[in-house]
């Protein structure tokens, strides 16, 4: 039996429980004191907060990793941050130029971007044209193609530009590598252990950053959603030469609210029309998401 006294007519509601402050620890990946940041809702605001904490310009930050100072593309910060995650900011280091001759259709690059204007190399395919150029490394930001600045371009735009470059004609890439700590110098894609390595959170709650509107605390994606997003990310790489876990998650979210393949195609066009996904990609994605759900039961 409910023993609570009935509320008198006109009585005010009890005050809402205060939302806890979400404070995140951060360091510069090449080495710095630990800073603390809060009050951001998207990646650009996050970069501004990190820059303010360390007295640098936001445009100095190329990308961030979670719980590791290394240039580890599996630890890239995307649209979700675990509430206990430690944020490492990788800032601009040396600029370098390389000349490339496109002897095959594909260069062997997979591109991603930081959500704040910089596209960078996420993967280099073994045995590819780029793999044979020692100066080009995973984590390098692509600043210009043939002196044409691509700062501000999205990853899919950069990938398209590279695909459309004519074969047998040399071109120049201007790259900016992340500034490296002493123990990381000379490493192409791996680095030795850092004395300060943050603990990885085992919690399921994350802060989800949004390009519009306030950030929200949400449960981490389910195993089914995570598996489906990984398959979509693989297809993004295969069809478009990019990897983008947040875009993949948005595609899965669109599929979840679609009654069938045609509704899914319309939903993608409405929400993510700027990407101009090819029809065969949409068909494969719909099938892959269904297979991921079946595989996970």
From Swiss-Prot:
Span of domain PDZ: 97-177
UniProt xrefs under PROSITE patterns: PDZ
Coiled-coil zones: none
Keywords assigned: Deafness, Disease variant
InterPro entries: GH2_GIPC, GIPC1-3_GH1, GIPC1/2/3, PDZ, PDZ_sf
Keyword Transit peptide: no
Tissue specificity annotation: Expressed in adult lung, brain and testis. In the inner ear, it is expressed in the inner and outer hair cells of the organ of Corti. Also expressed in cochlear spiral ganglion neurons.
Transmembrane region(s): none
Function description: Required for postnatal maturation of the hair bundle and long-term survival of hair cells and spiral ganglion.
Family the UniProt entry places it in: Belongs to the GIPC family.
Linked pathology: Defects in GIPC3 underlie the age-related hearing loss 5 (ahl5) and juvenile audiogenic monogenic seizure (jams1) phenotypes. Ahl5 mice show irregular structure of the stereocilia bundle of outer and inner hair cells, late-onset degeneration of the organ of Corti. The spiral ganglion exhibits a severe loss of neurons.
Name assigned to this protein: PDZ domain-containing protein GIPC3
Taxonomy of the source species: Eukaryota, Metazoa, Chordata, Craniata, Vertebrata
Gene expressing this chain: Gipc3
């Amino acid at each position: 039996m409910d023993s609570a006294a009935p509320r008198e007519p006109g009585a005010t509601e009890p005050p809402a429980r205060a939302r806890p402050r979400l404070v995140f620890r951060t360091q510069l990946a090449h080495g710095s004191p630990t800073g603390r940041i809060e009050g951001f809702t998207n990646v650009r605001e996050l970069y501004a907060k990190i820059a303010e904490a360390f007295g640098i310009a936001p445009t100095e930050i190329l990308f961030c990793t979670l719980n590791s100072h290394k240039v580890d593309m599996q630890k890239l910060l995307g649209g979700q941050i675990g509430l206990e995650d430690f944020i490492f900011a990788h800032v601009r280091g040396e600029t370098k130029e390389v000349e490339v001759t496109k002897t095959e259709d594909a260069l062997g690059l997979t591109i991603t971007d930081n959500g704040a204007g910089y596209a960078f190399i996420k993967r280099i395919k073994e045995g590819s044209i780029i793999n044979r150029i020692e100066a080009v490394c995973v984590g390098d930001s692509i600043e210009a193609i043939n002196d044409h600045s691509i700062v501000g371009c999205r990853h899919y735009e950069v990938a398209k530009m590279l695909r459309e470059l004519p074969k047998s004609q040399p071109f120049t890439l201007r790259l900016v590598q992340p500034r490296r700590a002493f123990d990381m110098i000379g490493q192409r894609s791996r680095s030795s252990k850092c004395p300060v390595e943050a603990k990885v959170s085992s919690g399921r709650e994350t802060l989800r950053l949004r390009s519009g509107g306030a950030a929200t605390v949400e449960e981490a994606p389910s195993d089914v959603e995570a598996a489906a997003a990984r398959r979509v990310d693989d297809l993004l790489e295969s069809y478009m030469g990019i990897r983008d876990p947040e875009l993949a998650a948005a595609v899965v979210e669109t599929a979840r609210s679609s009654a069938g393949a045609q509704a899914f195609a319309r939903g993608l066009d409405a929400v993510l029309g700027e990407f101009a996904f090819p029809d065969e990609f949409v068909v494969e994605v719909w099938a892959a998401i269904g297979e991921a759900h079946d595989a996970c039961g």
